[in-house]
């Protein structure tokens, strides 16, 4: 039996008492229109910390530093039910491009800095609100 799996990382970017949430593109196959933090798969040769920094920059244009691991997760995704294991990092933004506006990739249609404790009105994947509530 093969033990192949992919490693995923998630960046919860916290600035003061807010976290950055991104609205998934309606073209996304998985959870279109849901709100989530930056996330993606780790590339060959990367550490989880390097991957979360890269993913945050690719999806938002923000330079971040990982502060600590908040959570670990495991799931199956897609028609082939690819197995993923991953880590959710609390990250702090270091600087912003331009005037501090988030620069979105094609994966998302909107970005919002949401106060901790006010995420209930946002449609999210199971478990994410629990992680965010623990930060409040």
Q: Model segments located where?
A:
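Conserved N-terminal beta-strand and adjoining loop/helix that marks the start
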Residues: 1-20, 90
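Short connector loops at helix/strand junctions that flank enzyme active sites
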Residues: 4-6, 14, 32, 37, ...
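Conserved Nudix-box catalytic region and its N-terminal flanking loop in Nudix hydrolases
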Residues: 18-58
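A short coil-to-beta-strand element that immediately follows conserved catalytic motifs
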Residues: 62-71
